[in-house]
Each structure stands twice: as C-alpha cells, then as structure tokens.
Amino acid sequence: MTRNWSFRVIFVSAMWCALLKFATLEAPKDDFEYDGGCPFVVLDNGTHVKPAGCSHLCNGAPETLDNIECYNVTEEVAKRMTPGIPYACWLGWCSKGECKRDNRTEVCYRGSEEE
C-alpha cells in the first residue's frame, strides 16, 4: 500500500510542476522588423539561389557577406539581366565582402520581379 501511495505522490508532484511550467510560459516577443534592410540581389540556377556579388550599400552603410558561395557578377549587371534567359555566370566564394572568382561557371537566371 505504501508503494502505491508513493507513486501517486510522485506522479501528482510531477504533473503539478509540468502544469506550472507550461502555465507560466509566455509567447516569445518578436521585435525583429522584417520590412527593414536591403536584401541582396540573387540569381537562380534552377535549384538554388546565390547572391550576385558579396557587398552593397544599404541606407548609405556597407553590407557584406562572408563564407558563402556567390556569383561573380555585380548587382548592377544582375539587375540588367533579362528575366528567364540563361547566362553563364562565374562562381565564387564571398571573402570579406568580395566574391573571389574560381574557375567554374554555371548557368544562372534572373528571376522575375513577382517571385
């Protein structure tokens, strides 16, 4: 009988603790402004997108990317590409805001503005 009583006390205590924990949790506050900032221009290769270059100005301040694959194309050139037309783009790797070109190319596309 004592064993059954001990189990009930432990079970009720555990349930009470769980109830208190979940009853006091608040939803996290999301203070991030998703409409701010300046997104990088990206080009598509049919399965993935990569940034065109690794740096740009955002509200007068430089923004850079690091340690990510990129296309060795300036944002200005990428913006002038005709959407949906295949281009041969040099691949590179972002290092301190510069897209360091390697010896590979792949087909890339500029997406439409609606995407």
Curated annotation (Swiss-Prot):
GO molecular-function terms, A-Z: C-C chemokine binding
Glycosylation sites: 45, 72, 103
GO annotations of cellular component type: extracellular region
InterPro entries found in the cross-reference section: EVA_Class_A (IPR045797)
Keyword Nucleotide-binding: no
Protein name: Evasin P1183
Key word Ribosomal protein present: no
Function: Salivary chemokine-binding protein which binds to host chemokine CCL2.
Signal peptide range in chain numbering: 1-25
Subcellular location: Secreted
UniProt keyword annotations, A-Z: Disulfide bond, Glycoprotein, Secreted, Signal
Disulfide bonds: 38-58, 54-94, 70-99, 89-108
Lineage top rank: taxon: Eukaryota
Main location: secreted
Organism: Amblyomma triste
